[in-house]
């Protein structure tokens, strides 16, 4: 049954995120209700060699004013620059449909720190990337 499959995928994504507790704890303030928070590329592979910390937030509606404040505070204490992409869920899906390479690469490499069930629900109808 597809609900069980989606639940299993969300569980596996959550389990994978638990391998990155440092980042989950560091950025938990950015998880605001209906959001999906991802970290991707070099910070998860080899932080010491990373140039920056790449994050993506997917939101249902408008931007939340708290996000910029949280990023500014984190930037004061983290030695690497934070590179944030914030998209609505519709913008994200449109980028996937248009086969935007940068978004596809994020999907392939990202760790879903928060919002795993929402992420699975969001991408369930994507045909191919």
PLM features: what roles do these ranges have?
Residues 1-35, 45-50, 59-129:
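Catalytic core of pol beta-like nucleotidyltransferases
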């Amino acid at each position: 049954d597809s609900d069980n499959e989606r639940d299993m995928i969300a569980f596996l994504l959550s389990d994978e995120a638990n391998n990155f507790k440092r980042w989950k704890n560091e950025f938990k303030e950015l998880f605001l209700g209906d959001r999906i928070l991802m970290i991707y590329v070099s910070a998860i592979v080899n932080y010491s060699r990373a140039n920056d910390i790449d994050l993506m937030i997917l939101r249902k509606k408008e931007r939340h004013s708290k996000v910029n404040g949280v990023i500014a505070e984190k930037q004061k204490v983290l030695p690497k620059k934070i590179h944030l992409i914030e998209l609505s869920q519709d913008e994200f899906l449109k980028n996937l449909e248009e086969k935007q390479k940068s978004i596809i690469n994020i999907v392939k490499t990202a760790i879903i720190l928060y919002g795993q069930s929402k992420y699975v629900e969001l991408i369930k109808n994507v045909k191919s990337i």
